Amino acid sequence: MVKSHIGSWILVLFVAMWSDVGLCKKRPKPGGGWNTGGSRYPGQGSPGGNRYPSQGGGGWGQPHGGGWGQPHGGGWGQPHGGGWGQPHGGGWGQPHGGGGWGQGGTHGQWNKPSKPKTNMKHVAGAAAAGAVVGGLGGYMLGSAMSRPLIHFGNDYEDRYYRENMYRYPNQVYYRPVDQYSNQNNFVHDCVNITVKQHTVTTTTKGENFTETDIKMMERVVEQMCITQYQRESEAYYQRGASVILFSSPPVILLISFLIFLIVG
């Protein structure tokens, strides 16, 4: 008799879960598609100029007026004003100042830094959405993409792009889509950080970009950022649908009752 009841409840649970899945799939996805109403990004019509001006009072990517990537006015990649890669003002590779390289401020421990604790939640989030980039304020690096084939309206620029496209990035930097109100804001920020990071990194290697390069790079990165937004929106929607499914009161009630029957 108990087995008959268990079989009936399993059937009811199966039907309820599939009903909720169907409802979840009908929910609208966040964000719009490419070119769905509204103006495009500010300054796009000016040839040769930067179509993605920085926002706010500081320089590019400066929330509080520091240099590039400086949340509080330190050097590049310095959260609190230390040297490059120095979170708290110590020497390179010194988390809290003092000591020689790799000592972390303690004498007699040459080249034996303490092992950082691993936060499993951060690891899971990075695996789901991309690797978090250190020193870039929570930005993640997307997976490599094929550079899009773009026509710029004249033979010279089309030929120039085909000959130099390998110099432009094939990955973009971005933040989670739930931090933006729409696709335009996501793409604008994605283009700014990606072009700036690629330009700085390449310039340090002795290679410079012309205005034509910057113009083409922005177009290429824009298309890749749109693709990245669509991927992240789909993944965000699927994660939300799963949470809604298993947090539905009827499903919770049925699962609880089924467990009660099995245990009892």
From Swiss-Prot:
Query: Carbohydrate attachment sites?
Result: 192, 208
Record-linked SUPFAM superfamilies: Prion-like
Question: Where are lipid groups covalently attached, annotated GPI-anchor amidated alanine?
Answer: 241
Homology family: Belongs to the prion family.
PANTHER family from the entry? DOPPEL PRION, MAJOR PRION PROTEIN
Name assigned to this protein: Major prion protein
Gene3D superfamilies tied to this protein: Prion/Doppel protein, beta-ribbon domain
Q: Where does Cu(2+) 2 bind?
A: 80-82
Residues noted as binding Cu(2+) 1 in the record, renumbered to the chain: 72-74
Q: Which Pfam families match?
A: Prion, Prion_bPrPp, Prion_octapep
Which residues lie within the region annotated Disordered? 28-118
**How would you summarize the oligomeric state and partners of this protein?**
Monomer and homodimer. Has a tendency to aggregate into amyloid fibrils containing a cross-beta spine, formed by a steric zipper of superposed beta-strands. Soluble oligomers may represent an intermediate stage on the path to fibril formation. Copper binding may promote oligomerization. Interacts with GRB2, APP, ERI3/PRNPIP and SYN1. Mislocalized cytosolically exposed PrP interacts with MGRN1; this interaction alters MGRN1 subcellular location and causes lysosomal enlargement. Interacts with KIAA1191.
Q: Which organism is it from?
A: Tragelaphus imberbis
Q: Where is this region: 6 X 8 AA tandem repeats of P-H-G-G-G-W-G-Q?
A: 54-103
- Which clinical disorder is mentioned? Variations in PRNP are responsible of transmissible bovine spongiform encephalopathies (BSE), a class of neurodegenerative diseases that affect various mammals. These diseases are caused by abnormally folded prion proteins. BSE can be subdivided into at least three groups: classical, H-type and L-type, with the latter 2 collectively referred to as atypical BSE. Susceptibility or resistance to a BSE disease can be influenced by at least 3 factors related to the host prion protein: protein expression levels, number of octapeptide repeats, and specific polymorphisms.
- The secretion signal range is 1-24
